[in-house]
Curated annotation (Swiss-Prot):
UniProt subunit comment: Monomer.
PROSITE patterns in the record: AA_TRNA_LIGASE_I (PS00178)
Sequence motif 'HIGH' region, location on chain: 128-138
Family: Belongs to the class-I aminoacyl-tRNA synthetase family.
Gene Ontology terms: biological process: arginyl-tRNA aminoacylation
Protein name from the UniProt record: Arginine--tRNA ligase
Source organism of this protein record: Albidiferax ferrireducens (strain ATCC BAA-621 / DSM 15236 / T118) (Rhodoferax ferrireducens)
GO cellular component, one term: cytoplasm
Pfam families xref list: Arg_tRNA_synt_N, DALR_1, tRNA-synt_1d
GO molecular function: arginine-tRNA ligase activity; ATP binding
Catalyzed reactions: tRNA(Arg) + L-arginine + ATP = L-arginyl-tRNA(Arg) + AMP + diphosphate
Compartmental location: Cytoplasm
């Protein structure tokens, strides 16, 4: 129906131009809030009434008369009604809605996607410190980041996925010292092990695993490097390098199991080694954007919207963490990414203003509001009716690997994407493995498998060819259930566009659940494999199109579309 809507919108623009030159391009179609009011609606008359000094309802009547004589409206529109102060509601003919089936079947996996724009976008997500296993919060971030990448790819963007490793901070030193203690035979609870509220140590069993492999002089491979342990318990730098490589490898395995890949791994340490951090500080100093106070170097970030000036270099000569962040984002800009999105936890909210202030102060041509941020809350895990807080492997939290092993990759992805990122979420493990309609991922996947079963039965019994359904006569698709399904299929491309613009993959989950429910209602109302060949082929074409859209939407989420369940 997208082609039909384009025709109708062009006719609307032409009619508005006739009534008020220059007004046409501003008009859009909306979906009526009440389905009974029609299939499309526009408020163009009410928007134009004031500048034209006309009664909005009378203007709507004039516009209605103009539309009724235009060819696209004569061909595709059944009725145009005026409601309230000047709402224009449009009811489409069944033939208009039926066009969606042809569009879906002809475009296949490309249905809903836009042609390439040439625009480049970088999405940075997960970016976990290599100090422990990925936790459930990282899982939510991985699902969000990957789905947002997929959404923007449907909109024609060239999307680049990047993982930023904070491998130059204090936590890496704690990782090294904890591994060294384990290698020396100590464990949490021993007098030699750091204890207390602010103890600098990692207590999870994974530290013992790292130490054992280090003593065994093993070689570990991470995404872009390999490191062989020396086994020397006194060589703290060797222990640090091995532990980081070990955990990067473990994180790589978790991400692979979650079907998330990255185009690049960017190391924080490279910003120091390349001189990019020093270059940023010099640029800001030379531009007069810094000052000395109490032995520290400060950025005049309040000049750029921050609530207070920020320390860049502490009295001991070390940089605060936001300085390499500014250098990193300048690197993103210099690599040609006009749009950058950072997926981070809500605990990073305070960094947004200072990073953007630093980028503006650097004066390298970066626009205000760069980069975009999507902030998410943490995830609470419930199993057997009780909250799960601790993993033996991690020592203090539930890992992403735990969740995948308890349920499945598909369930974890769908569940973690089913709410707005900034909404608190409880992951119910028992629900995620349930094979019933209460489980949303099962419900959607079952709808797809159910259609595949119908198509398979048709192929087996009659030698049917799904490819031939694109030429089916669709005129039998007249029932309320069929028309509702057709209209919902037609909304898929617009839903994708809106979800991408709002960084809202949860909208895709809502749509898929609604589509699955609509299909199940249709299936219950009309038998597909009837004796009448004309009716049968029309209904098969409709359900084949539905399966394709379910498949496409699940792919955006990184969830499989099984043919059997």
């Amino acid at each position: 129906m997208l082609s039909v809507k384009i025709e109708l919108l062009e006719a609307l623009h032409q009619a508005l131009e006739k009534l008020s030159p220059g007004a046409g391009s501003k008009a859009v179609f909306e979906s009526p809030k009440v389905a009974a009011h029609g299939d499309l609606a526009t408020t163009a008359a009410m928007q134009l009434a004031k500048p034209l000094k006309l009664n909005p309802r009378q203007l709507a009547e004039n516009l209605r008369a103009e539309l009724l004589v235009r060819a696209p409206f004569e061909r595709w529109v059944e009725a145009i009604d005026i409601a309230g102060p000047g709402f224009i509601n449009i009811k489409l003919k069944p033939e208009a809605k039926q066009q969606t089936v042809r569009e879906v079947l002809s475009q296949g996996q490309q249905f809903g996607s836009q042609p390439g724009t040439g625009k480049r976008m970088l999405v940075e997500f997960v970016s976990a410190n290599p100090t422990g296993p990925l936790h459930v919060g990282h899982g939510r971030q991985a699902a969000l980041g990957d789905a947002i990448c997929n959404l923007y790819q449907t909109q024609g963007w060239a999307v680049y996925r990047e993982f930023y490793y904070n491998d130059a901070g204090v936590q890496i030193g704690t990782l090294a010292s904890s591994t060294q203690l384990r290698a020396r035979g100590f464990k949490p609870g021993d007098p030699e092990w750091p204890s207390g509220e602010n103890a600098a140590a990692y207590n999870g069993d994974y530290i013992a695993d790292i130490a054992a492999d280090y003593l065994a002089k093993k070689t570990v491979h991470s995404d872009d490097r390999a490191f062989t342990a020396s086994g020397d318990v006194e060589a703290l730098d060797d222990i640090r390098l091995f532990a980081v490589a070990y955990l990067r490898h473990e994180q790589d395995l978790d991400l692979k199991a979650f079907a998330v890949h990255f185009d690049n791994y960017y190391l924080e340490s490279s910003l120091y080694l390349s001189g990019k951090v020093d270059d940023v500080v010099k640029r800001l100093h030379d531009a007069g954007k810094t000052y000395e106070h109490d032995g520290a170097l400060w950025l005049k970030s309040t000049e750029y919207g921050d609530d207070k000036d920020r320390v860049m270099r502490k009295g001991d000569g070390s940089y605060t963490y936001f300085v390499p962040d500014v250098a990193y984002h300048i690197s993103k800009w210099e690599r040609g990414f006009e749009k950058v999105v950072n997926i981070q936890g809500t605990d990073h909210h305070g960094t947004i203003a200072r990073v953007r202030a630093g980028l503006q102060a650097a004066n390298v041509g970066i626009p205000k509001g760069y980069p975009d941020y999507v902030l998410h809350t943490m995830v609470r895990v419930v199993r057997g009716g009780e909250e799960v807080k601790i993993s033996k492997r991690a020592g203090s939290y539930v890992t992403l690997r735990d969740l995948i092993e308890w349920t499945s990759k598909d369930a974890v992805r769908f569940f973690l994407l089913s709410r707005k990122p900034d909404t608190e979420y409880t992951f119910d493990v028992d629900l995620a493995v349930a094979k019933n309609n209460d489980n949303p991922v099962y419900y959607v996947q079952y709808a797809h498998a159910r259609i595949c079963s119908v198509l398979a039965a048709w192929r087996e019994k009659e030698g049917g060819d799904v490819a031939s359904l694109g030429q089916a006569d669709l005129s039998p698709l007249q029932s309320p259930q069929a028309l509702a399904l057709l209209l919902l299929l037609a909304k898929y491309p617009e839903m994708l566009t809106a979800a991408a613009a709002g960084f809202a993959p949860h909208d895709v989950t809502f749509y898929l659940r609604e589509l699955a429910a609509c299909y199940h209602s249709y299936y219950d109302a009309e038998r597909i494999l009837v004796d009448d060949d004309l009716i049968k082929r029309a209904r098969l074409a409709l359900v084949a199109a539905t399966a394709q859209v379910l498949h496409n939407g699940l792919a955006v989420l990184g969830v499989s579309a099984p043919q059997k369940m």
